């Protein structure tokens, strides 16, 4: 295994087949990128990936966090403070109003605090350097934090749905409509503030050094869509669900304030908007489970990556192409490239790496270069995987 620089400052690893090193008759001889070749390269089209930079150049702050992760940490800290203050107010207001809907909102805020604290811990853990055991570092801890955030909300919501169902069956409860209206109004303001804090409009992305995280490419578009840190995304979805519920609670409190006989609006609003909160977290849960199952990122399809590699001059075939992700924004690829015996392996490696980084935003690529053999066309292990 030999390191090879690639454009964009991302990490690239070159694997050279031993049989290609020792092939008789002048087999593949890899020319060093750091010394002048003994003889000039043959004339041919200039490859766009021939300009290199050192493979470990990146933009990481002294604290070990990339700018995007440092921003995510600040957002989560601010949201935690706002969430705790207004959660305490909702607990008091819900107790005074005897409102299950208000207590439901407070419970969701409590779940948000717990999930954001878990996200902050996972952000800290992800800055730890890679080890010989954890060779990719601790990036996956961010995904686990997002999973814990979603699961905690589902558990709390399930309990509150059960309590709301009991209130629909039994009407022996009283609600202080004035206290409920005031608390619901404050809750709406609190969730709007948290949504503003967590909203990531114009989060930076980079087409240069890969210290900045690439967000998944939006399906059908050619530019990366910056979703920011996974934990902030999960927290933002939480807050959106809470905001919808708070608006529903506010509407119910207005109705109960003017029409006390319609107090059943309290458990009904709890029931309806808890279901909405569950539905709003389903996409995040789906993405997190896909990452944990080592699935290909939803924004990167197999065929375009394969076709990009095959379009490199000198590449005859590709096999063992694998796409996966450590987080929603940290994408990884590996592949074997079978090339012509007369092709320059270094030039092909540079061009293939450059195209993968620039077109798909991979954070890490591992490419193995080997000489093309006719039996590869019939090899069962070299066949493409079937469509899911």
Swiss-Prot record:
Binding site for Zn(2+): 108, 112, 238, 242
A Gene Ontology biological process term: response to zinc ion
InterPro entries: Cation_efflux, Cation_efflux_CTD_sf, Cation_efflux_TMD_sf, CDF/SLC30A
GO molecular function terms listed in the Swiss-Prot or TrEMBL record: antiporter activity; metal ion binding; zinc ion transmembrane transporter activity
Residue positions, PTM Phosphoserine: 63, 66
Keywords: Antiport, Cytoplasmic vesicle, Endosome, Ion transport, Lysosome, Membrane, Metal-binding, Phosphoprotein, Synapse, Synaptosome, Transmembrane, Transmembrane helix, Transport, Zinc, Zinc transport
Catalytic activity: Zn(2+)(in) + 2 H(+)(out) = Zn(2+)(out) + 2 H(+)(in)
Any single Pfam family the record assigns to this protein: Cation_efflux
Subcellular localization: Cytoplasmic vesicle, Secretory vesicle, Synaptic vesicle membrane; Synapse, Synaptosome; Late endosome membrane; Lysosome membrane
Sequence segments annotated as region (Disordered): 1-42
Cytoplasmic side: 1-75, 127-145, 199-235, 285-388
Assembly and binders: Homodimer. Homodimerization could regulate efficiency of zinc transport. Interacts with TMEM163.
Alphabetized PANTHER family for the sequence: CATION EFFLUX PROTEIN/ ZINC TRANSPORTER, PROTON-COUPLED ZINC ANTIPORTER SLC30A3-RELATED
Protein name (Swiss-Prot/TrEMBL): Probable proton-coupled zinc antiporter SLC30A3
Native source species: Rattus norvegicus
């Amino acid at each position: 295994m030999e390191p090879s620089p690639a454009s964009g400052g991302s990490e690239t690893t070159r694997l050279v087949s031993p049989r290609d090193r020792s092939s008789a008759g002048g087999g593949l001889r890899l020319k060093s990128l750091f010394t002048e070749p003994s003889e000039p390269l043959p004339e041919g089209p200039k490859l766009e990936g021939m300009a290199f930079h050192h493979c470990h150049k990146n933009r990481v702050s002294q604290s070990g966090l990339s700018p995007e992760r440092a921003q995510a940490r600040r957002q989560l800290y601010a949201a935690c403070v706002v969430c705790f203050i207004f959660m305490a107010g909702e607990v008091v207001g819900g107790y005074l109003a005897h409102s299950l809907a208000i207590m439901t909102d407070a419970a969701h805020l409590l779940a948000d605090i717990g999930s954001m604290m878990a996200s902050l811990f996972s952000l800290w853990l992800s800055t730890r350097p890679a080890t010989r055991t954890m060779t990719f570092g601790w990036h996956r801890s961010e995904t686990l934090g997002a999973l814990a955030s979603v699961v905690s909300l589902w558990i709390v919501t399930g309990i509150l749905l059960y309590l709301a169902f009991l209130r629909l069956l039994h009407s022996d409860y009283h609600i202080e409509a004035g206290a409920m209206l005031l608390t619901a109004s404050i809750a709406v303001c609190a969730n709007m503030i948290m949504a503003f804090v967590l909203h990531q409009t114009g989060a930076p992305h980079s087409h240069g050094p890969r210290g900045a995280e690439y967000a998944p490419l939006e399906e059908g578009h050619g530019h990366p869509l910056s979703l920011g840190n996974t934990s902030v995304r999960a927290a933002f979805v939480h807050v959106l669900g809470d905001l919808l519920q708070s608006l529903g609670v506010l509407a119910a409190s207005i109705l109960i304030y003017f029409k006390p006989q319609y107090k059943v609006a309290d458990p009904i609003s709890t029931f309806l908007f808890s279901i909405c909160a569950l539905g709003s977290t389903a996409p995040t849960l789906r993405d997190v489970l896909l990452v944990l199952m080592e699935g290909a990122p939803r924004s990167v399809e197999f065929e375009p990556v394969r076709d990009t590699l095959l379009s490199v001059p000198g590449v005859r075939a590709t096999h063992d192409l694998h796409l996966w992700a450590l987080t929603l924004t940290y994408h990884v690829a590996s592949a074997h490239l079978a090339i012509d015996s007369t092709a320059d392996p270094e030039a092909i490696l540079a061009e293939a790496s450059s195209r993968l980084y620039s077109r798909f935003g991979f954070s890490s690529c591992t490419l193995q270069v080997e000489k093309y053999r006719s039996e590869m066309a019939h090899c069962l292990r070299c066949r493409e995987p079937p469509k899911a």
